[in-house]
Amino acid sequence: MKKLSALLIFFLCATAMPAQSSLLRILSGLAKAGQAITLTDEQLAAAVKESVAAMDKKNTVCSASSAYTQRLKRLTKGMNAADGIKFNFKVYKTSEVNAFACPDGSVRVYSALMDALSDDELLGVLGHEIGHVALRHSKKSWQDALLRSAASDALGSFSDTWAEFSASSWSSLGESMISAKHSRHHERQADDYGYEFLKKCGRNPWAMGKAFKKLKSFSEKSGSTKYAKLLYAFSSHPDFDERIRRMRERAEEDGYSCH
């Protein structure tokens, strides 16, 4: 069994990335064998890419000529990568308010969020989301989700079930991850990353605090599902008031206006 498991691990790590259904079949077999499994950054990115592709297919992606895409392109000009992760940006045309960044570098922004925020505020939120990826906060969450999916295969490690792993399944996996909460420590780190991100973009980093103020006002609108996903992701501690206070203190200390 050890030799077989070692062979499977070697195959998983050394070959070109197979179709994602094959990856899940292999992971399922290893999980059933009780083996500890880790994924390389490249393997994880390939699996996440499949999930993001399914979400892109499920959602309405704004065309390259749309005002939303052009605005995002203008704001993110020159933002090609961070910490070795290459970005690709798209806008979803939707009434929901959200944005997310994934370990493969995919960054997706919802049009309603763009409607709600100024350029600087939007960059702050993007910086926060990119921070979770650049600081590797998202990596373990996605890896754990993939391994849970593999372990849940009840029909055998090489059954046709994984070969038929559907686009809707990939999409559901992705959606569960983009709304996942992070720890208090990770949220503070991502806030600080967003703050520094704004400074590097030549913007007033207090826009990070202003974005939090708007998110707080959204959270006070009872009965609305429009902001549900974004607010759920941002609702873990620290709370909005603390985040706003921290951003204000940092901005004032750095000599920026906080109006």
Describe the role of every protein-language-model region:
Residues 4-13:
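Sec-dependent N-terminal signal peptides
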Residues 20-259:
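A Zn2+-metalloprotease active-site environment signal
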